[in-house]
Regions:
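Active-site HxH/HxHxD metal-binding segment of metal-dependent hydrolases
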Residues: 26-27, 31-104, 195-196
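Active-site environment of divalent metal-dependent phosphoester hydrolases
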Residues: 22-24, 48-54, 71-74, 119-121, ...
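Conserved N-terminal glycine/acidic-rich loop preference
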Residues: 6, 17, 79-89, 185-193
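Active-site neighborhood of phospho(di)ester-bond hydrolases with catalytic His/Asp-centered motifs
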Residues: 17-20, 41-51, 65-68, 113-116, ...
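Catalytic core of the metallo-beta-lactamase
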Residues: 1-36, 40, 92-164
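Accessory terminal helices/loops
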Residues: 164-171, 178-231
Length: 231
């Protein structure tokens, strides 16, 4: 799994967004921040999936924020989130996972809350550098994934909400995939993919060739076929 962690630094203090993913990577990130004399001041989780609500003791006991729906799901779905972690996570990492509260970071950010990909999913806009931290959307390697409750319309509304930020962004950071300068092109590709499958039941999106994506493509076809006449 290719994952991205975003570290927003101001005057030696950091907002840590979606620290991930493996225990040794979390430990290495904590060590790197110490070496650079950067103190974690706050954390933020973009959504309540197990690889986005992680933490490490080396980051410190600081406020960890999320949207209200994400914070709620992190509590109510905790058993499933823990089960998804796997055997390499130690008890201290398991205990820290998902301990987020509803709130907004003190850093200069704008939160863009929607229900695409997951209920309460949140993108983070950094206005001065014009960076869009997109969570699990706008990926160059993953197809659009309208996960539980498989609400494709909510995903399409989320793309509409993200559009002005994608237009303004100099940099886009997806949860999985490569950092890029092509936020609007990625948004257009996601819209085209969903529209093609909705209209014809097919898509030739090149991301289908990436690991796990063809299965997600087939799932989307099933979801849309249940509500759309694809003949």
């Amino acid at each position: 799994m290719q994952t991205n962690t975003t570290v927003v630094v101001a005057s030696g203090r950091a907002l840590l967004i979606d620290p991930a993913w493996l225990p040794d990577e979390l430990g290495a990130l904590a060590a790197e921040l110490r070496e650079r004399e950067i103190t974690v001041a706050e954390g933020f989780a973009t959504h309540a999936h197990h690889d986005h609500v992680l933490w490490h003791p080396g980051f410190g006991d600081v406020p960890r924020w999320a949207s209200s729906r994400t914070a709620e799901l992190a509590r109510t779905e905790r058993d499933d989130l823990v089960a998804a972690l796997g055997p390499d996570f130690t008890p201290d990492l398991i205990d820290l996972m998902g301990r987020v509260d509803a709130g907004t970071p003190a850093f200069d950010v704008e939160l863009i809350v929607h229900d695409g990909h997951a209920p309460g999913h949140t993108a983070v806009w950094l206005p001065e550098p014009r960076v869009l931290v997109a969570g699990d959307m706008l990926s160059d390697v993953e197809l659009p994934l309208p996960f539980w409750p498989h609400d494709v319309a909510a995903y399409e509304r989320a793309l509409d909400l993200l559009e002005p930020y994608a237009d303004a962004a100099r940099i886009v950071i997806p949860g999985h995939g490569n950092v890029g300068t092509d936020a609007r092109a990625r948004l257009d590709a996601d819209r085209r993919y969903l529209a093609d499958v909705r209209r014809t039941g097919r898509s030739d999106d090149p991301r289908r060739a990436n690991a796990g994506m063809d299965a997600e493509y087939e799932l989307l076809r099933e979801i849309l076929a249940a509500t759309t006449d694809l003949s």
